[in-house]
Amino acid sequence: MAITDTINVAIVGASGVTGGSIVNGLLALTGLTVKITALTRPESLNKPANIQLKERGVQVVAANLRGPLEKLVDLLSSIDVVISAIYWGSLDDEIPLANAAKAAGVKRFVQSAYNIPAAARGVTHLRDKKEVILSHIQQLRLPYTYIDVGWWYHVVLPRVASGRTEHALPFGMPDLPIALDGNIPSGLTHIRDIGRYIARIILDPRTVNKKVFVYNELYTQNQLCDLVERLTGEMPQRRYISEKCVQSWLQEALDELERNPSSDIALGVVSLREVFLASNVHGTNTPEYAKYLGYLDGKELYPDFTFLTYEDYVEEVLDGMHSQTVA
């Protein structure tokens, strides 16, 4: 989609962490008018987060993604771009959303991806589900962009004994081991930069019907620990484990998911460990591998993009910033 004077964007999940970053990124765009419509569940219409969106000029409307297709098509009739930041337990709702977007003539559909680059099947349970949705989008011939962002900064933040980084870690985040020798690089992105990347991507005709990998910096697990040790004077725990141990660690989570197949918590644990294996053992979370898979490289697309460095992020954490959020 070419840049025009006005762009109408609908977001599913605008009140969440990722959705909030996307809203911020869109509202920060200059040189054009951005009209944002947040699609929310009817029962959530008057929740504080949605009221705050309204106060920022976002139109918040009730939408039942599992309701009559005609009503959803009507809501999207004036929309140029649909962006999903839907809760990962509700990914299947993107199927009717895509159907409505196609019928409404939406010019670009961005599904909820925002993870590490990976092969189409067999890497993570959530990736498999997202690829099914992407296949459906492609069968519709609905223009799309698939965006991956690597690990989020706060998910890989090392702990220290004093607890100075604890407030910035996701709720319930376990201590992550270090895979192999800890020297495999991995792409990292701060949550507030994700929305800014997406705002650039949806205005870029080069990214239509493409996968895009954006990231801020590459770090190994050892480099993350070295950085935190240098800035805090404390040595993070380094628990090195073999590939066999990572596989066993993952299998424990898979067994729990098999016992509780409807548990979002069990699926979340499996997903975290699958991503850990893929990125920190198999080395898939890199621009080189992403290019091999056919992704466009955000560094090449947007060489002028400024971002929060990981070192500056850690400094801000040590100053008490970046409160806990979900992973």
Curated annotation (Swiss-Prot):
This is Asnovolin J 5',6'-dehydrogenase nvfM. It comes from Aspergillus novofumigatus (strain IBT 16806). It is found in: Membrane. The keyword Phosphoprotein does not apply. Belongs to the NmrA-type oxidoreductase family. One of its GO terms (molecular function) is oxidoreductase activity. Keywords: Membrane, NADP, Oxidoreductase, Transmembrane, Transmembrane helix. The active site is at K130 (proton acceptor). It is a single-pass membrane protein. GO terms for biological process: novofumigatonin biosynthetic process. GO terms for cellular component: membrane. The lineage of its organism: Eukaryota, Fungi, Dikarya, Ascomycota, Pezizomycotina. It catalyses: asnovolin K + AH2 = asnovolin A + A; chermesin D methyl ester + AH2 = asnovolin J + A. Its EC number is 1.3.99.-. SUPFAM superfamilies: NAD(P)-binding Rossmann-fold domains. PANTHER family: NMRA-LIKE DOMAIN-CONTAINING PROTEIN-RELATED (PTHR47706:SF9), NMRA-LIKE FAMILY PROTEIN (PTHR47706). Disruption phenotype: Completely abolishes the production of novofumigatonin and asnovolin A, but accumulates asnovolin I and asnovolin K. NADP(+) binds at G13, A14, S15, G16, V17, T18, G19, K47. The chain crosses the membrane at residues 9-29. Pathway: Secondary metabolite biosynthesis; terpenoid biosynthesis. The keyword Mitochondrion does not apply. Asnovolin J 5',6'-dehydrogenase; part of the gene cluster that mediates the biosynthesis of novofumigatonin, a heavily oxygenated meroterpenoid containing a unique orthoester moiety. The first step of the pathway is the synthesis of 3,5-dimethylorsellinic acid (DMOA) by the polyketide synthase nvfA via condensation of one acetyl-CoA starter unit with 3 malonyl-CoA units and 2 methylations. DMOA is then converted to farnesyl-DMOA by the farnesyltransferase nvfB. InterPro entries: NAD(P)-bd_dom_sf, NmrA-like, NmrA/Isoflavone_reductase-like.
